[in-house]
């Protein structure tokens, strides 16, 4: 089974990806892991990626696409199938993935889209606070400290609501064309992500069993 998982930051995509890998035994292919492995193994694309990263530059699409292609061509993929997590990030990368899969004789079986209302995600992502003395992390709503005094805690700049909202806006603008592309191919299953983790996975599992 060859899968793609999508969802906005904070939707619980990583948690569900780990559960899918555990339950269905597919290879988990996350962008960060792929880059690290390609650079550690000094593959052609890994060396190219490292040359950009060492200069503090963004890795161009053609290199990212090349690293994905290298990984998808490995033997375990044909045996186990895969779950792509964090790629494609743009519609251009989605088209490149289509071409790669066709070239390798693979096909995408389904796209799991974890849906959570953006306003809920702002609350989830902007609630993180850090104790000034201990460095411990808490959440204003989901994991509040026992003796909360506002002056004892601070919030990182990228956890502030306006920053979180901007990040979500960027992700939505990039993600919608990708979802639309796969919807036209009849591959997308939307999963309600604003429920308990176990309930989310029950819905994911049901959808995947129907694909098998």
From Swiss-Prot:
It holds the Pfam family ADK. PROSITE patterns: ADENYLATE_KINASE. It catalyses: AMP + ATP = 2 ADP. One of its GO terms (biological process) is AMP salvage. InterPro entries: Adenyl_kin_sub (IPR006259), Adenylat/UMP-CMP_kin (IPR000850), Adenylat_kinase_CS (IPR033690), P-loop_NTPase (IPR027417). GO terms for cellular component: cytoplasm. Residues 127-159 are annotated as: LID. One of its GO terms (molecular function) is adenylate kinase activity. Keywords: ATP-binding, Cytoplasm, Kinase, Nucleotide biosynthesis, Nucleotide-binding, Transferase. Its main location: cytoplasm. CDD domains: ADK (cd01428). The keyword Cytoplasm applies. Pathway: Purine metabolism; AMP biosynthesis via salvage pathway; AMP from ADP: step 1/1. AMP binds at residues 31, 36, 57-59, 86-89, 93, 156, 167. Its EC number is 2.7.4.3. Residues 30-59 are annotated as: NMP. ATP binds at residues 10-15, 128, 137-138, 195. It is found in: Cytoplasm. It is an enzyme of class 2 (transferase). Consists of three domains, a large central CORE domain and two small peripheral domains, NMPbind and LID, which undergo movements during catalysis. The LID domain closes over the site of phosphoryl transfer upon ATP binding. Assembling and dissambling the active center during each catalytic cycle provides an effective means to prevent ATP hydrolysis. Monomer. PANTHER family: NUCLEOTIDE KINASE (PTHR23359). Catalyzes the reversible transfer of the terminal phosphate group between ATP and AMP. Plays an important role in cellular energy homeostasis and in adenine nucleotide metabolism. Belongs to the adenylate kinase family. This is Adenylate kinase. It comes from Streptococcus pyogenes serotype M3 (strain ATCC BAA-595 / MGAS315). The gene is adk.
């Amino acid at each position: 089974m060859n899968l793609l998982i999508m969802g906005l930051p904070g939707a619980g995509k990583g948690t569900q990806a780990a559960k899918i890998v555990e339950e269905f035994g597919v290879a988990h292919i996350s962008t960060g892991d792929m880059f690290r492995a390609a650079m550690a193994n000094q593959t052609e694309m890994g060396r190219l990626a490292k040359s950009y990263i060492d200069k503090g530059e963004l890795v161009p699409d053609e290199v990212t696409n090349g690293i994905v292609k290298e990984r998808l061509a490995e033997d375990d993929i044909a045996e186990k199938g895969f779950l792509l997590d964090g790629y494609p990030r743009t519609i251009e990368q989605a088209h490149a993935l289509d071409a790669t899969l066709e070239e390798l004789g693979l096909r995408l079986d389904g796209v799991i889209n974890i849906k959570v209302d953006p306003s809920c995600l702002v609350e989830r992502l902007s609630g993180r606070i850090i104790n000034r003395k201990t460095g411990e992390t808490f959440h204003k709503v989901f994991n509040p400290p026992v003796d909360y005094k506002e002056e004892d805690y601070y919030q990182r700049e990228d956890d502030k609501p306006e920053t979180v909202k901007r990040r979500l806006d960027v992700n939505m603008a990039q993600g919608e064309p990708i979802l639309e592309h796969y919807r036209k191919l009849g591959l997308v299953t939307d999963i309600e992500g604003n429920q308990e983790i176990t309930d989310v996975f029950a819905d994911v599992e049901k959808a995947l069993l129907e694909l098998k």
